[in-house]
Amino acid sequence: MTSPSARAAQPRPVAAASSDRWWLWMVIAASMLALDQGVKWIVAQNLPLGASIAVTEWFNLVHVLNPGAAFSFLADAGGWQRHALTVLGVAVSVVLAGLLWRGVGSPVERVAYVGLIGGALGNVVDRVRIGAVV
């Protein structure tokens, strides 16, 4: 028979319990990826490249292709950035999926992780498919 103090000292199998929910988080991330690609498809089908729609006085939706990172950082770097940013997007997604597997973070953090995974992989799809992010 094990004493209460010995039972308390034994590590709990966190990964096994987290891996059950991990699939749920990955389904949500895949849904975010599908939503990302769906919205980009709607924009590409209905808004000519370079055109914009005023949503409010201070917010416009503009159809652009960004070969760089955020705010066109590295957009004119000569093409190597496409591959580097693709690898970075996949790497970040793998790290965040690993954190979800381990059960790291609060539920709010996990929702943020799946949003980041969905968006990062959406950008990876764009870079592989058309060489830039819509």
Go through each PLM region and give its residues.
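Alpha-helical transmembrane bundles and membrane-interface segments of multipass inner-membrane proteins
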Residues: M1-V134
